[in-house]
């Protein structure tokens, strides 16, 4: 009988705590769900400063300019003072004006991932640019990720057989490492990459992800047309 009374008393003491915890979680969820609105205060080329009255978005968050077509995404790169962020535009800033409304998406830039993305070309914000329609992928992943831990990396030294005899003989590639190809214009860097993509797919059954960072549009277009 005494044990039952003690248990009932403990339950009564626990109920206010659970109610307070539930209200705390609800408040946090409501705060996270709230979309922060800001306005553009400066445009300097691809650099756009956005002012927020409250809920300053964290670094690397994606912002979107309201009522703009095509959509323009801004990535937060720096905090300036208490209520202003400096962002980098992921596309052209022509036509932007001071006072234009900006919305915080609440997360970093995310792109589609999965088997549906194989053979597709997308820009940095995950929009398809190969004129083959939308990518029907239900999964997305942020473009920023932590580097894998050293304990998760393989320490075995193994040669990646590329199928290119001059590479495998004179400068073999180590599997799992990084490789740099340096050369002038027109010496065959892109051709070598296309051979690697082809041989990795056919000889090893693997997948290749080609990211054109700072590349000219013509080179990416030529590579795509050659590979299909």
Swiss-Prot record:
Pfam families: ATP-synt_ab (PF00006), ATP-synt_ab_N (PF02874). InterPro entries: ATPase_alpha/beta_chains, ATPase_F1/V1/A1_a/bsu_N, ATPase_F1/V1/A1_a/bsu_N_sf, ATPase_F1/V1/A1_a/bsu_nucl-bd, P-loop_NTPase. It catalyses: ATP + H2O + 4 H(+)(in) = ADP + phosphate + 5 H(+)(out). It is an enzyme of class 7 (translocase). It comes from the Eukaryota. Residues 1-31 form a transit peptide. Keywords: ATP synthesis, ATP-binding, CF(1), Hydrogen ion transport, Ion transport, Membrane, Mitochondrion, Mitochondrion inner membrane, Nucleotide-binding, Transit peptide, Translocase, Transport. GO terms for molecular function: ATP binding; proton-transporting ATP synthase activity, rotational mechanism. It is found in: Mitochondrion; Mitochondrion inner membrane. Its EC number is 7.1.2.2. ATP binds at residues 183-190. GO terms for cellular component: mitochondrial inner membrane; proton-transporting ATP synthase complex. SUPFAM superfamilies: N-terminal domain of alpha and beta subunits of F1 ATP synthase, P-loop containing nucleoside triphosphate hydrolases. GO terms for biological process: proton motive force-driven mitochondrial ATP synthesis. The keyword Nucleotide-binding applies. Mitochondrial membrane ATP synthase (F(1)F(0) ATP synthase or Complex V) produces ATP from ADP in the presence of a proton gradient across the membrane which is generated by electron transport complexes of the respiratory chain. F-type ATPases consist of two structural domains, F(1) - containing the extramembraneous catalytic core, and F(0) - containing the membrane proton channel, linked together by a central stalk and a peripheral stalk. During catalysis, ATP synthesis in the catalytic domain of F(1) is coupled via a rotary mechanism of the central stalk subunits to proton translocation. Belongs to the ATPase alpha/beta chains family. F-type ATPases have 2 components, CF(1) - the catalytic core - and CF(0) - the membrane proton channel. CF(1) has five subunits: alpha(3), beta(3), gamma(1), delta(1), epsilon(1). CF(0) has three main subunits: a, b and c. This is ATP synthase subunit beta, mitochondrial. It comes from Drosophila virilis (Fruit fly). The gene is ATPsynbeta.
């Amino acid at each position: 009988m005494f044990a039952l009374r003690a248990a009932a008393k403990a339950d009564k003491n626990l109920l206010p705590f659970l109610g307070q915890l539930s209200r705390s979680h609800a408040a946090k969820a409501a705060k996270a769900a709230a979309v922060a609105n800001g306005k553009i205060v400066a445009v300097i080329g691809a650099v756009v400063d956005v002012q927020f009255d409250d809920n300053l978005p964290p670094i690397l968050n994606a912002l979107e300019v309201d009522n703009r077509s095509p959509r323009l995404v801004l990535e937060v790169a720096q905090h300036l003072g208490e209520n202003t962020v400096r962002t980098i535009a992921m596309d052209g800033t022509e036509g932007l004006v001071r006072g234009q409304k900006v919305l915080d998406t609440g997360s970093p830039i995310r792109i589609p991932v999965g088997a549906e993305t194989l053979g597709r070309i997308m820009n940095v914000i995950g929009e398809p640019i190969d004129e083959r329609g939308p990518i029907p992928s239900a999964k997305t992943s942020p473009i920023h990720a932590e580097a894998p831990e050293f304990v998760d990396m393989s320490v075995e030294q193994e040669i990646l057989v590329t199928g290119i005899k001059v590479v495998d003989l004179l400068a073999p590639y180590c599997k799992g490492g990084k490789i740099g190809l340096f050369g002038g214009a027109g010496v065959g860097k892109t051709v070598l990459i296309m051979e690697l993509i082809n041989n990795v797919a056919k000889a090893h059954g693997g997948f290749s992800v080609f990211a054109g960072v700072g590349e000219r549009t013509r080179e990416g277009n030529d590579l795509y047309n050659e590979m299909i």
